[in-house]
Amino acid sequence: MQESTANKVAANATSSFTEHLQRDRPELLPFNRSGQGSATAAAPLQVPHATTIVAMSYNGGVLMAGDRRATMGNVIASRHIEKVFPADRYSVLGIAGTAGIAIDLTRLFQVELEHYEKIEGTLLSLEGKANRLGAMIRGNLPLAMQGLAVVPLFAGFDTSAGVGRLFSYDVTGGRYEEHEHHTVGSGSVFARGALKKLWRPNLSAEEAVAVAIEALFDAADDDSATGGPDTVRKLWPVVYTVDSTGTRRVAEPQLAAASQHVIEARTIAGREA
């Protein structure tokens, strides 16, 4: 009996955890829970939304940063939300859109990559990770059509090519490789303007952190759904770097120092806008 069960499990084994859930427990998928896919919302749901994410390449890797504010309509739902997460040892994921679904999707993606490594005995390629994330977003399309969209930003270090790479997505799961830098979320247009002026090739990791802080400051200046560094509450953006050694979360003292430098520079300049 035990051997028969083991053989059955082996026969049904798949390197995709999402595929396994879709086949055996579809109700556990964040985009396939009972009643969600067929519901017709009469009015927009008031749920927390994550806002602005910025990412850029630097000399030897990639960086991703996100502000800490979540909004629900015209209300600040949270000042502490984290929107950038390590997907595995060599990649990070930033979320914009419906916060609850985005966080569930992030956890599923983390398990997906861990499951693949356990089954196959090797890491999935960065290209493969980007493709699998696109397939997950495509699965959320019915909810996106109801206004519960998730639009992530994915970045990682390609160990085979020895470079950092950035990928953006649309709500249909379309995957697009970006170069130099990219932004998503409600404040993205303002953050992108800052990146166009401040980014340059071969930034150091420390310089990239400073550029990301500047971009989030600019986004928070003009977008009420984006929260800039909060010096009163000592709340700083979540920032990750990824290089040949893996992912690293930038320490809060470094973020505090970079934020203070931006504030002092703008105070001296007497900037009003």
From Swiss-Prot:
Compartment(s) of residence: Cytoplasm
One Pfam family, short name: Proteasome
Catalytic activity field: Cleavage of peptide bonds with very broad specificity
Keyword Protease applies: yes
Enzyme class: hydrolase
Pathway terms, separated by semicolons: Protein degradation; proteasomal Pup-dependent pathway
Family: Belongs to the peptidase T1B family.
Stored PANTHER family: ATP-DEPENDENT PROTEASE SUBUNIT HSLV (PTHR32194:SF0), METALLOPROTEASE TLDD (PTHR32194)
Record's subunit section: The 20S proteasome core is composed of 14 alpha and 14 beta subunits that assemble into four stacked heptameric rings, resulting in a barrel-shaped structure. The two inner rings, each composed of seven catalytic beta subunits, are sandwiched by two outer rings, each composed of seven alpha subunits. The catalytic chamber with the active sites is on the inside of the barrel. Has a gated structure, the ends of the cylinder being occluded by the N-termini of the alpha-subunits. Is capped by the proteasome-associated ATPase, ARC.
Name listed for the protein in its UniProt record: Proteasome subunit beta
